[in-house]
Amino acid sequence: MNNKYTIIKQESIEELNGTGYILKHDKTGARVVVISNEDDNKVFQIGFRTPPKDDTGVPHILEHSVLCGSREFPMKDPFVELVKGSLNTFLNAMTYPDKTMYPVASCNDKDFQNL
């Protein structure tokens, strides 16, 4: 870990042959879950609570809008570009009734850092 996080909980996870950590980012309060083991496939996911106020589908529209780029990052469809040149083992975005998630995975360290 590093000095920007406080370890809230640590425990062995036998099913994954590893150790699980729940961390809290000291500055933002963001919760981070880390599972450390010997698996070559590295996975990262960022997720947000997105409870809808109605049934118009705004969280799902926002999921796609986030991936449309911006002035600072002018890339129309980053997933398409990543798939072209990435060794990813998983790359997606998902909206559930109460949350939106963006998971990525790769067995290649350099590629994983680029995702």
What role is predicted for each listed range?
Residues 18, 36-114:
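M16/MPP (pitrilysin/insulinase) zinc-metallopeptidase core fold and M16-derived inactive scaffolds
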